């Protein structure tokens, strides 16, 4: 039986506790739910059957994304049950590539708040803002400033969908409990004129500040996280290449920080290169490499590849 201080409608409005038609008769009696939900007890399999039926009626992946996010806002358990019932089918809907279209239209498809939104205008009060988050034991924050979302460029506040989606993968793929996760958007403005003139844009209607102002804002944020959530790892996601590399170097020796674009993509790609070389019967140092552009992922891979080449006997200059 569920153990919670919440009862009745309050419980049904909490997506982390709501099970809708899956509450047992004993739970309905104990939690004040009799008459508030249909008088049946469904299995998760039957609930999933209904979800799939409703998804089949959606004509596009964007509409399926909107449906699934709405499900997440009402019943977290059923959302993750759905995603993990068929990861190959659902991960491209809740994250890349569909998340790209969702971010482009974020202000237009927005339903209700998820995560936190922290504006640069709150400088000097960042710690107080973080204390507004209801969960006090946050283990991972995924944070973006919307500076370079996927391959779409500066999306500003529309990029808030990225940390939301990325942390869904933490739970769906790694089993991290959702209550330990906090999606975060740092609003330092945008240079995207289209969004600055869009009445439904949800971010600050100012162009981006100087680099020094941005880094000062991020400094306060990172320090505030150490004080409010001392067990937390900060995951930087989809910053510009310059900012991604700089912020990682700025904090990595002092705090628990990680950049998926610089480190995660690089690690996975290098692993693929190493195994491809094994299949060919060659070594990394025997190959030539072409990088298209110099984004954060490319820079991260180039640095890691150089380290791997040095490990195979080359000098850093040769690498």
Give the residues covered by each predicted segment.
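Glycine-rich phosphate/diphosphate-binding loop of Rossmann-like nucleotide-binding domains
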Residues: 254, 259-319
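N-terminal ligand-binding/catalytic initiation module
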Residues: 1-256
């Amino acid at each position: 039986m569920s153990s919670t201080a919440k009862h009745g409608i309050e419980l049904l409005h909490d997506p982390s506790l709501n099970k809708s038609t899956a509450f047992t008769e004993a739970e309905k009696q104990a939690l004040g739910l009799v008459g508030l939900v249909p008088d049946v007890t469904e299995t998760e399999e039957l609930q999933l059957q209904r979800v799939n039926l409703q998804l089949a009626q959606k004509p596009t992946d964007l509409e399926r994304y909107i449906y699934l996010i709405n499900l997440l806002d009402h019943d977290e358990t059923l959302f993750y049950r759905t995603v993990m019932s068929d990861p190959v089918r659902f991960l491209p809907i809740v994250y890349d590539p569909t998340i790209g279209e969702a971010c482009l239209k974020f202000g237009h498809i927005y339903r209700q708040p998820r995560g936190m939104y922290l504006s640069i205008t709150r400088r000097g009060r960042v710690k107080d803002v973080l204390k507004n988050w209801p969960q006090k034991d946050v283990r991972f924050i995924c944070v973006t400033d919307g500076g370079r979302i996927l391959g779409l460029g500066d999306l500003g506040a529309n990029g808030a969908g990225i940390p939301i989606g990325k942390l869904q993968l933490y739970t769906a793929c790694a089993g991290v409990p959702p209550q330990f996760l906090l999606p975060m958007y740092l609003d330092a403005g945008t240079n995207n004129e289209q969004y600055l003139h869009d009445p439904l844009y949800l971010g600050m209607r100012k162009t981006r500040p100087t680099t020094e102002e941005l880094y000062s804002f991020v400094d306060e944020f990172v320090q505030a996280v150490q004080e409010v959530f001392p067990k937390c790892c900060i995951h930087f996601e989809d910053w510009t290449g310059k900012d991604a590399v700089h912020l990682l170097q700025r904090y990595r020796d002092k705090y628990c920080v990680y950049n998926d674009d610089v480190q995660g993509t690089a690690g996975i790609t290098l692993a693929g290169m190493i195994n491809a070389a094994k299949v060919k019967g060659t070594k990394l140092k025997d190959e030539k490499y072409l990088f298209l552009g110099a984004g954060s992922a490319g820079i991260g891979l180039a640095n890691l590849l150089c380290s791997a080449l040095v490990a195979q006997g080359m000098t850093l200059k040769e690498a």
